[in-house]
From Swiss-Prot:
Keywords, alphabetical: Disease variant, Endoplasmic reticulum, Glycosyltransferase, Membrane, Signal-anchor, Transferase, Transmembrane, Transmembrane helix
Name this polypeptide is given: Dolichyl-phosphate beta-glucosyltransferase
Cellular compartments per GO CC: cytoplasmic side of rough endoplasmic reticulum membrane; endoplasmic reticulum membrane; membrane
Known function: Dolichyl-phosphate beta-glucosyltransferase that operates in the biosynthetic pathway of dolichol-linked oligosaccharides, the glycan precursors employed in protein asparagine (N)-glycosylation. The assembly of dolichol-linked oligosaccharides begins on the cytosolic side of the endoplasmic reticulum membrane and finishes in its lumen. The sequential addition of sugars to dolichol pyrophosphate produces dolichol-linked oligosaccharides containing fourteen sugars, including two GlcNAcs, nine mannoses and three glucoses.
Recorded family membership: Belongs to the glycosyltransferase 2 family.
InterPro entries in alphabetical order: DPG_synthase, Glyco_trans_2-like, Nucleotide-diphossugar_trans
Gene from which the chain derives: ALG5
Enzyme Commission number(s): 2.4.1.117
Amino acid sequence: MAPLLLQLAVLGAALAAAALVLISIVAFTTATKMPALHRHEEEKFFLNAKGQKETLPSIWDSPTKQLSVVVPSYNEEKRLPVMMDEALSYLEKRQKRDPAFTYEVIVVDDGSKDQTSKVAFKYCQKYGSDKVRVITLVKNRGKGGAIRMGIFSSRGEKILMADADGATKFPDVEKLEKGLNDLQPWPNQMAIACGSRAHLEKESIAQRSYFRTLLMYGFHFLVWFLCVKGIRDTQCGFKLFTREAASRTFSSLHVERWAFDVELLYIAQFFKIPIAEIAVNWTEIEGSKLVPFWSWLQMGKDLLFIRLRYLTGAWRLEQTRKMN
């Protein structure tokens, strides 16, 4: 009996090793090059409040605002107004309290099929294009790609990415700012503060099925085991960057869709950029574009491939690249 068990164990180990080698080969051979940092001609401009074209700035220009808010939006004509109303109400009140405070909100329409750009442009007309700008992408790039386009067109010393659904209470940006400041001194002026829902985990578990809870824990384990250490919630769409940290991480990003957050933080940890994880107020909003099982499965595959592609040298981290 013992020899049979030993043989089965050896066979199992051999099959596992063969599977890992095969997956590594697939990861290496299917690895796409880093997406070209290229804008279509139409994406080099925004419309001012009068509907006239103006050239977008670059993240490699000197900052002229204290805060940039980048809002990736795909078919968000219904949910975007709630988020924009809350954000702009807060930002306007803050500016009245402190006239030295300056900001901009950049809505990036990621190839939407609805009226997202028109809805966003109404805020540009109301507040002016110095405060609200709309970038309409020619085709869908994915959430990470849309955020990158917004960040590379920003003017802020600090840059916040915030989801269009308004799930995170916008005034919590102050918590992220404090978290960022607590990380000082910043090496090479780079630091990141991540909004986190980890403190809400017990409450969310009580509302989820056992299967979804199992998927959640499995995903968290894979993130920790394969890519990012010490960050409990990598997926919250509320993150604050110094300008230098944003340019370094987003110029090195390969993944432009759902698992981009994980690669982003993997890159940050590779470059030893300090990261703070800050609890924020978060509410689940109806209309999610994720199908739970398949989205977790896809992201699990992405995590494995992210790790293997860096390990095998298919992907390499480079110095900061500029967009054409």
